[in-house]
Swiss-Prot record:
One of its GO terms (molecular function) is RNA helicase activity. It comes from Vanderwaltozyma polyspora (strain ATCC 22028 / DSM 70294 / BCRC 21397 / CBS 2163 / NBRC 10782 / NRRL Y-8283 / UCD 57-17). Keywords: ATP-binding, Helicase, Hydrolase, Nucleotide-binding, Nucleus, Ribosome biogenesis, RNA-binding, rRNA processing. A motif (DEAD box) lies at residues 307-310. This is ATP-dependent RNA helicase DBP7. The Q motif is unique to and characteristic of the DEAD box family of RNA helicases and controls ATP binding and hydrolysis. The gene is DBP7. InterPro entries: DEAD/DEAH_box_helicase_dom, Helicase_ATP-bd, Helicase_C-like, P-loop_NTPase, RNA-helicase_DEAD-box_CS, SPB4-like_CTE. A motif (Q motif) lies at residues 144-173. It is an enzyme of class 3 (hydrolase). One of its GO terms (biological process) is endonucleolytic cleavage in ITS1 upstream of 5.8S rRNA from tricistronic rRNA transcript (SSU-rRNA, 5.8S rRNA, LSU-rRNA). Residues 42-56, 64-75, 701-711 have a biased composition (Basic and acidic residues). Residues 178-372 form the Helicase ATP-binding domain.
Length: 732
């Protein structure tokens, strides 16, 4: 009995201990999240959770790896030391090799001045001679006047007194007698940019109408149609004709362009007009749908002018132009009403360049035409040249430095503006920056116009005046207004914004007096626009064809005035582009060193402040200031998600646009030769292009799938597309 009691006592004690152990060391903990279960199990086992160290802590711990670890009295390492050593091993492998790069912040701030591709060009193959005496090639002729060209005296007086034009240019002297003669030949006018082609064909047409003894008014019919490739150029010709017809108010021009109200245009056409100016799509639309237009053309139409003919063909208007010409030629012409006018419809083509596409259009539109050119090259009109008084500069800039070098260039121009303003308080200078695509225009406009809160919108979101305290350029005085206005212009803007922006940039009034105006734009502003007082043209992105290069730089050095142009090229293959454009620059160019000629003068001996913290130390080293300026833009990309989206769109669109160069220039502009990481740096992006793609894919993948489109929604969508297509032609 005693043994049994002892056995029961021993058994009872063992059972209690086993039960306690089983409660403490039960096999599985259930319920809750796995992290909580893991923590609970480790606590039950008397262990602490392993804390993963950051990279900084790991680097600090590496400093003590050679030190002998402390041991306890038994000579063994403590448990905490063992767990810490094990944690180091556990941390290193997963972070480096197994973590998805889109899930961690792996940004690396690369230096602006390292790992740049070596510039291969050491000698300027087409040096500009500063000592050579230059006579402007597109200037008005000093020895001639409009009286000798048999223009109506009423028009000559208006030119001299109201428009302040006394002397004709060389192309005007050649064209006016041809259009005023009785031979009635079609003409192909080929002349340099800025040489006055608009007046060359507008003056004789207007003079011919004024010479008629018959009284005319807006009900007399349409005498001439002017077709242009862009809305901006059509608007400019409309303003020129409006100014010319101020001497004969009974003659009325009419503008027909996409983006405007067709109802208002129809009303103007029904009232009557003497000149129609517009883009191909809208003109064809009215010819097909507005009956009053056809009725006016039968009696009066005598002239059809195709301005910038090469661009009309390049933009795919060949079929539209063919339809317009067919409709015009199908109209039976009645010459008895105005016998003093030509007995047939005269066709006039105008272009600063002559290519195969223009010749093709000439064969369709012209009959027995005569070529008129003021070019020195008579047998090879392909080799159009830039104005002699234009100073061309070329800078070979690594892709990482494109943005900061552009800032240095604008700063240098602004310093000159400040010096000129000391002599003349209301001095206005204008600079045009050409870029390859609209998204790139948006990025550079935002980067330079809204770096902080010190700015004010002037024309919607497309024109901004920088105000006191703005420090986007090193030359800005924080105590004074910078007198700096940024504009943007591209085909994706609405027609109203495009028109108002261009008008604000072009007009010299109290709002812009004494200010430096900078326009960021695509090639929409490269054709035919006579923008006043353009001092410098900057081609940050090379043109898609050499003809576009000639038209871009043709915005400056117009009508005999001096001007400058700066072309940015990347090191490597793009350097061969200089040899390609050499025949067009007969007076040579200056090869600019981006370090000594641009960055150092702008960033030396100035204090560029950091945007993230205030520092009392003044830094005068140019490279440090340039780096600080660029990092300020990068920090803004990190902090402002909307600006980051603009930067990423600009970067992606720039690469897509880069791949669209014409085939014969692909050897200079090969997208496979671009360093995409360095190019991303020029858009203030720190992420690698691959990481950006992963993030975009992930974001797109997480978006919910769109349900199948209903028949009703599809009908409305197609209707909206039809309305949009009919409201305007190619949105250039």
């Amino acid at each position: 009995m005693i043994e049994d009691d002892g056995m029961l006592l021993n058994f009872s004690t063992d059972t209690t201990e086993d039960n306690n152990d089983s409660k403490f060391n039960s096999g599985k903990v259930t319920g809750g999240r796995w992290k909580e279960r893991r923590k609970l199990k480790m606590m039950m086992e008397g262990r602490e959770p392993v804390k993963r160290k950051t990279f900084e802590e790991l680097e600090n711990s590496d400093m003590d790896t050679n030190k002998k670890p402390k041991s306890d009295s038994s000579g063994r390492k403590s448990y905490n030391q063992q767990s810490n050593n094990e944690s180091v091993k556990d941390v290193v492998r997963p972070v480096v090799s197994k973590v998805n790069p889109s899930q961690v912040n792996t940004q690396i701030v690369s230096s602006l001045f390292t790992a740049a591709r070596q510039v291969e060009t050491s000698v300027n193959i087409n040096e500009h001679d500063d000592k050579e005496e230059i006579n402007p090639s597109n200037a008005p002729l000093a020895a001639d006047n409009f009286d000798s060209l048999k223009i109506e005296q009423q028009l000559v007086n208006h030119l001299n007194e109201k428009m302040r034009i006394q002397k004709p240019t060389s192309i005007q002297k050649l064209v006016l007698p041809q259009l005023l003669s009785s031979k009635n030949n079609d003409l192909f006018i080929h002349a340099q940019t800025g040489s006055g082609k608009t007046l060359a064909f507008a003056l004789p047409i207007l003079s011919k109408i004024l010479s008629m003894k018959t009284r005319v008014d807006r009900k007399s019919g349409c005498f001439a149609i002017f077709i242009t490739p862009t809305r901006e150029l059509a608007t400019q010709i409309y303003h020129v004709l409006s100014e010319l017809t101020n001497c004969c108010h009974y003659l009325v021009p009419c503008l027909l362009i996409g983006g405007e109200s067709k109802k208002s245009e129809k009303a103007r056409l029904r009232k009557g007009c003497n000149f129609i100016i517009g883009t191909p799509g809208r003109i064809l639309d009215h010819f097909q749908n507005t009956q009053s237009v056809k009725e006016q053309l039968a009696v009066s139409l005598r002239y059809v002018v195709l301005d910038e003919a090469d661009k009309l063909m390049e933009l795919g208007f060949e079929e539209t132009l063919t339809d317009i010409l067919k409709l015009i030629h199908d109209i039976s012409l009645n010459t008895s009403v105005y016998p003093q006018l030509p007995s047939r419809i005269m066709h006039i083509l105008c272009s600063a360049t002559s290519k195969g596409s223009v010749t093709k259009l000439g064969n369709v539109a012209l009959q027995n035409y005569k070529m008129i050119s003021n070019s020195h090259v008579t047998n090879e009109l392909e080799n159009a040249t830039v104005p002699d008084q234009l100073l061309q500069k070329i800078a070979i800039v690594p892709p990482k430095l494109r943005l900061v070098t552009l800032a240095a260039t604008l700063d240098s121009i602004h310093r000159k503006h400040i010096e000129q303003k000391k002599k003349k308080l209301d001095y206005v200078s204008r600079t045009v920056v050409f870029l390859s695509c609209s998204d790139s225009v948006n990025f550079h406009f935002e980067a330079f116009s809204s770096s902080d809160a010190n700015h004010r919108n002037l024309v919607g979101e497309s024109a901004r005046l920088l105000t006191k305290g703005n420090d986007i350029l090193p030359s800005f005085d924080p105590e004074n207004d910078p007198d700096f206005i940024c504009y943007k212009l591209h085909g994706s803007l609405s027609q109203q914004i495009r028109s108002s922006t261009l008008q604000h940039f072009s007009k010299t009034n109290e709002n812009v007096k004494g200010k430096h105006l900078v326009l960021f734009c695509t090639d929409v502003a490269s054709r035919g626009l006579d923008l006043p007082e353009i001092g410098t043209v900057i081609e940050l992105d090379p043109p898609f064809a050499v003809e576009d290069h000639l038209h871009r730089i043709g915005r400056t050095a117009r009508a005999g005035k001096h001007g400058e142009s700066l072309l940015f090229l990347l090191p490597g293959e793009e350097e061969g582009y200089m040899e390609y454009i050499k025949p067009y620059h007969t007076k040579g160019w200056k090869l600019v060193n981006y370090t000594n000629d641009l960055l150092k003068p702008s960033f030396q001996n100035v204090n560029v402040k950091r945007s993230d913290k205030e520092t009392s130390k003044n830094v005068e080293e140019w490279d440090t200031n340039a780096t600080t300026w660029h990092l300020n833009v990068e920090r803004r990309v990190l902090e402002d998600s909307s600006f980051k989206d603009i930067a990423m769109k600009g970067y992606a669109s720039h690469i897509r646009a880069y791949a669209t160069h014409i085939s014969k220039e692909k050897k200079f502009f090969n997208v496979k030769c671009l360093h995409l990481g360095h190019l991303a740096k020029s858009f203030a992006l720190r992420e690698r292009p691959k990481t950006m793609g992963l993030q975009n894919t992930k974001n797109g993948g997480e978006a919910k799938k769109n349900s199948k489109e209903s028949a009703k929604n599809k009908m409305f969508r197609l209707a909206r597309m039809a309305v949009k297509q009919s409201s305007g032609e190619f949105n250039y």
